[in-house]
């Protein structure tokens, strides 16, 4: 009788739980929830079902529910779109179809439509969403969604960049990832959030370069200061590098940082980078009318 493990007699070995199957797990009450209205529910969780976000999904730290738009289609063929009013190319998702899907999602969560004409997605917006109960995401297709249903449901439009995709599914996954990673316990080390790009701990600037072993590679060395053990010097170096990179690569952020020397959000119209200094600006405004007591 062979002592070989049973797996040796199998033709294939596969994981017991696949990313898509994670969505079949019972949802955890009170956990952050993403409802996704989409024509392609099989696209989720996608890469969100892997690595840290996938493990967090399996652990119930966040929930994911897809709402197939086709289920609410009209007629025998379950049509979800029609020709644009006023003429033009393409098709537009019908208001009545989208309304039915959003009603199925419920009205307890903010609704966001992933659209290139939306406000830029920022770290501050992702942080605000992570602090809330969740979000309902609309994944657009064709020429978009009938404006009337967006107005009726007070839908916020968010863009992930100045370019156009074939649909909103990838954009929705970007927003989910940017948000879920900020939920406590999702990342293995929450301290890693403190000094990354756009974070408050990094003054809203870009993150400094990172290095690891080996100390020498292809004639290139790790900066000596990072191996010195002098934590104050390392902090100064990283702060200096963050400023240098921001100035070179994101002049919009740098102008904002110079203007406030606190937070790049002062220059929101130029950068669209963050609105996390709003409270600071409002505080200064509230006190601007007070009499000068130093005179």
Segments (PLM) and residue ranges:
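S-adenosyl-L-methionine/SAH cofactor-binding core of RNA-modifying enzymes
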Residues: 92-141, 146-147, 184
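Oxyanion-binding "anion nests"
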Residues: 249, 262-271
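Hydrophobic/aromatic beta-strand patches that form the interior of the parallel beta-sheet core
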Residues: 35-37, 65-67, 110-112, 135-137, ...
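N-terminal nucleotide/polyanion-binding subdomain common to many enzyme families
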Residues: 1-102, 227-255, 274
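Long, charged alpha-helical interface segments
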Residues: 198, 202-261
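Long, low-complexity, intrinsically disordered segments
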Residues: 278-295
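Short, solvent-exposed amphipathic alpha-helical segments in soluble enzyme
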Residues: 51-56, 127-131, 152-153
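Structured adenosyl-cofactor binding patch, chiefly the S-adenosyl-L-methionine
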Residues: 145, 149-196, 200
């Amino acid at each position: 009788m062979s002592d070989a493990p049973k797996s040796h007699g199998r033709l294939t070995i596969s994981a017991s739980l696949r990313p898509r199957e994670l969505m079949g797990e019972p949802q955890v009450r009170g956990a952050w929830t993403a409802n996704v209205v989409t024509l392609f529910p099989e696209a989720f969780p996608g890469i969100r079902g892997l690595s840290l976000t996938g493990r967090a999904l399996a652990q119930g730290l966040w929930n994911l529910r897809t709402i197939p738009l086709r289920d609410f289609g009209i007629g025998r063929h379950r049509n979800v779109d029609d020709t644009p009013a006023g003429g033009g190319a393409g098709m537009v998702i019908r208001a009545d179809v989208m309304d039915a899907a959003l009603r199925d999602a419920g009205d307890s969560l903010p609704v966001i439509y992933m659209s290139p004409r939306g406000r830029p997605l920022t770290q501050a917006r992702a942080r605000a969403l992570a602090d809330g109960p969740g979000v309902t995401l609309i994944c657009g297709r064709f020429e978009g969604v009938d404006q009337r249903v967006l107005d009726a449901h007070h839908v916020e439009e968010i863009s992930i960049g100045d370019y156009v995709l074939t649909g909103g599914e990838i954009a929705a996954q970007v927003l989910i990832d940017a948000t879920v990673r900020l939920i406590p316990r999702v990342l293995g080390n929450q301290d890693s959030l403190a000094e990354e790009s756009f974070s408050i701990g990094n003054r809203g600037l870009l993150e400094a370069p990172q290095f690891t072993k080996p100390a020498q590679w292809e004639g290139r060395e790790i900066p000596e200061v990072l191996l010195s053990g002098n934590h104050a010097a390392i902090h100064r170096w990283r702060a200096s590098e963050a400023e240098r990179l921001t100035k070179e690569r994101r002049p919009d952020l740098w102008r904002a940082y110079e203007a406030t020397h606190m937070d790049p959000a002062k220059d929101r119209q130029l950068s669209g980078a963050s609105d996390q200094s709003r409270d600071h600006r409002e505080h200064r405004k509230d006190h601007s009318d007070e009499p000068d007591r130093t005179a």
